[in-house]
Amino acid sequence: MRVDENLRLDEQLLLFMEQLEALEEKRQRLNSLIEEGWFSIAKARYSMGNKQVSALQYASEMQPLAHVETSLLEGGTAEFKCERSENKAEEQKTKTIEDIGAKETGLRRRVHTKQKEVKEGEQDTDEVKTKTDSPTPEHRNPLKWFGILVPQNLKQAQSAFKEVITLSVEIASLQSTILATRKEMQVQMKEKQERTEKAQLEVKEE
């Protein structure tokens, strides 16, 4: 019984140490990316000019390109996920194209089956083309605030800070997992200590 308890505690401790090591690696990577991003912005300012890369170029209306979704798992552990708007826009675009393709297939069948519905089919086709041609609202790339042709340094800065967002979410999830692991380990150690003290009292009484 005690062997199983000790083994379980050892496994829990090893897991805890592995999680701490992973957290340290992610934090180092995060700091490195932040430094890289700011250094790239500094180089872009040097080549374009300070006034060309500043808050003055920000759009009057902004929309976030990334959202953080949180969920509570079993045991009280919080999980964080990063959802990017460009991914959702791409999925929506693909779904729209599939829906339009299905409608066009249905129209062709109706035209071949019933000659009387040719005019109605043409009207439906025109509506489908109108929906296809109409521009869908998309999130504007923030790089375009600073011009059409921006230096590579500015693109590198954007890429670095995008990864910073993703990595920050991973770190938050890992920190929550570490807290849960530590709490579980503390509970096991407390139970073991109580059993040990109880056993010692029984020995003294004998």
From Swiss-Prot:
Keywords: Coiled coil, Cytoplasmic vesicle, Endoplasmic reticulum, Endosome, Lysosome. Residues 109-140 are annotated as: Disordered. GO terms for biological process: intracellular iron ion homeostasis; vacuolar proton-transporting V-type ATPase complex assembly. Residues 114-140 have a biased composition (Basic and acidic residues). It is found in: Endosome; Lysosome; Endoplasmic reticulum-Golgi intermediate compartment; Cytoplasmic vesicle, COPI-coated vesicle. Its main location: other. InterPro entries: Vma22/CCDC115. GO terms for cellular component: COPI-coated vesicle; endoplasmic reticulum; endoplasmic reticulum-Golgi intermediate compartment; endosome; lysosome; vacuolar proton-transporting V-type ATPase complex. Residues 4-37, 178-206 form a coiled coil. One of its GO terms (molecular function) is unfolded protein binding. Accessory component of the proton-transporting vacuolar (V)-ATPase protein pump involved in intracellular iron homeostasis. May be involved in Golgi homeostasis. Accessory component of the multisubunit proton-transporting vacuolar (V)-ATPase protein pump. This is Vacuolar ATPase assembly protein VMA22. The lineage of its organism: Eukaryota, Metazoa, Chordata, Craniata, Vertebrata.
